[in-house]
């Protein structure tokens, strides 16, 4: 079994729940260099706690009113573009850091890259399928769900 020395920990920057649980997890990991990859408010929290971070993710904004996502098709398109961009970003970081392990808290782009590069990876999630959209956009969303 290969020893893990370097771990890139990709934490979704959407909301603060991901980074909160990720900090609790990292506090229990010893003798491994951890580099967080995230953005937005999550990056600010990690920076204040003196974690090593790459603040590189800028997710699309979204508006929810009465439990309904506004502009669903537009948001889905923006999220798909964000995902493609995150794949490029995560591949660059993983290769530069020569990572031995990838931990992904709902960052599916880094997970895909890790699997393509045959790097051991761990997914942290509480979502098995999204249901943000209705109508024609839901067909695209279902296809994206299958790719996760």
Predicted regions: what they are:
Residues 71-101, 108-109:
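Conserved nucleotide-sugar donor-binding subdomain of glycosyltransferases
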Residues 10-23:
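A short, glycine/small-residue-rich beta-strand->loop->alpha-helix junction that serves as a flexible
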Residues 25-33, 45-46:
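A short, Lys/Arg-enriched amphipathic alpha-helix followed by its capping loop at the start of a domain
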Residues 120-148:
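Active-site-proximal region of nucleotide-activated glycan assembly enzymes
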Residues 13, 35-83:
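Conserved nucleotide-sugar phosphate-binding/catalytic loop shared by glycosyltransferases and other
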Residues 2-8:
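Extreme N-terminal starter segment of soluble prokaryotic enzymes
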Residues 33-38, 101-104:
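Short, hydrophobic beta-strand segments that form beta-sheet elements in well-ordered domains
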Residues 44-45, 102-117:
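An aromatic- and histidine-rich active-site surface loop
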